[in-house]
Design a protein with these regions (language model features):
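RNA/tRNA-interacting regions in translation and RNA-turnover enzymes
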Residues: 1-299
């Protein structure tokens, strides 16, 4: 994918609408009713090291002539979700799907304990129109302890174990029977709004505060950073703490804080220019090869 992006950057005439660089990952199945998102759910561009992260920071500096405040958040390794509330009540939940259309998983999301079925009264004043729908977004994940327990039970019953908590969360979310989802011990972190004009907040930091007030599960490991050094420190600390967290993370998301500045930077075909995902170095582990079986193939 990275080589394809570099090729298209050097030769724009080769870019086609069917290119993977122009699409958001995911799919829409036939098991659940399709739901069209209020606004497109974008992917994020990746920075594979601090040098690439600095290149993005330089683009931000070039856009505004100075370093502007950014919000650093842990990148949860789960499944994206969009929750729609009308008159303060949860009326719909949808997967990201292809970014434009997702799947209706409302019945299943209602079983996730930390998803408020109704917004707290104190937060309704933060809605510009309390009766109008507002779409809030985040990540559904499975805690490490729940994942381990699920796989122990699966193996005990002769069923195939899940490869990782992310797959387990996605599979649990798309169950036909909500009772199965309810028993999978899913959790969420909510961190975004589809249309910031729906709320009386001016930036990401203020949005996170409103989400907490409204009753959502918001990750406490966030930081408002005003310098490149502060961003680096957050990323390095996240790498150090990765194994100790009760849930899986695979990076840090850095976002320009002010919504007005986000709007000024805009989007590419697949990702916002005002955000970047700093990806952790791949984990290295040792595998012990206990035995091999040598066989002769049918062609000798």
């Amino acid at each position: 994918m990275r080589e394809l992006r570099e090729l298209e950057a050097a030769h724009p005439e080769l870019i086609d609408s069917s290119s993977p660089t122009q699409r958001v990952g995911g799919y829409v199945g036939e098991q659940f009713a399709p739901v069209r998102h209020e606004r497109r759910m974008y992917s994020l561009d990746n920075a594979m090291d601090l040098e690439e992260l600095d290149a993005w920071i330089e683009r931000v500096v070039e856009a505004f002539g100075r370093m502007v405040p950014v919000v650093c958040e842990l990148k949860i390794d789960g499944s994206s979700i969009a929750l729609t509330y009308e008159d303060g009540r949860l009326v719909r939940a949808a997967t990201r799907g292809d970014g434009t259309t997702g799947e209706d998983v409302t019945a299943n999301m209602r079983t996730v304990k930390d998803v408020p079925l109704r917004l707290r009264e104190a937060a309704l004043d933060g809605l510009r129109d309390a009766e109008a729908p507002v779409e809030l977004r985040g990540e559904v994940y499975m805690p490490k302890s729940s994942f381990d327990a699920l796989n122990v039970a699966a193996e005990a019953n002769g069923k195939q174990a899940f490869a990782n908590p992310r797959n387990a969360a996605a599979g649990s979310l798309r169950q036909k029977d909500p009772a199965i989802t309810a028993n999978r011990d899913l959790s969420t972190f909510i961190y975004a709004v589809a249309d910031e004009r729906a709320l009386a907040v001016e930036g990401q930091w203020e949005l996170l505060a409103w989400l907490r007030e409204a009753g959502f599960h918001v990750n406490p490991d966030v930081a408002l950073c005003e310098t490149r050094e502060a961003v680096h420190a957050f990323c390095k600390r996240a790498i150090e703490r990765r194994e100790d967290l009760p849930y899986e993370i695979d990076g840090v998301v850095v976002k320009v804080n002010a919504f007005s500045q986000q709007e000024s930077m805009g989007y590419t075909a697949r990702a916002p220019r005002w955000a970047i995902a700093f990806k952790f170095p791949p984990e290295e582990k040792t595998t012990l090869l206990r035995d091999i079986t040598v066989q002769v193939g049918r062609t000798g």
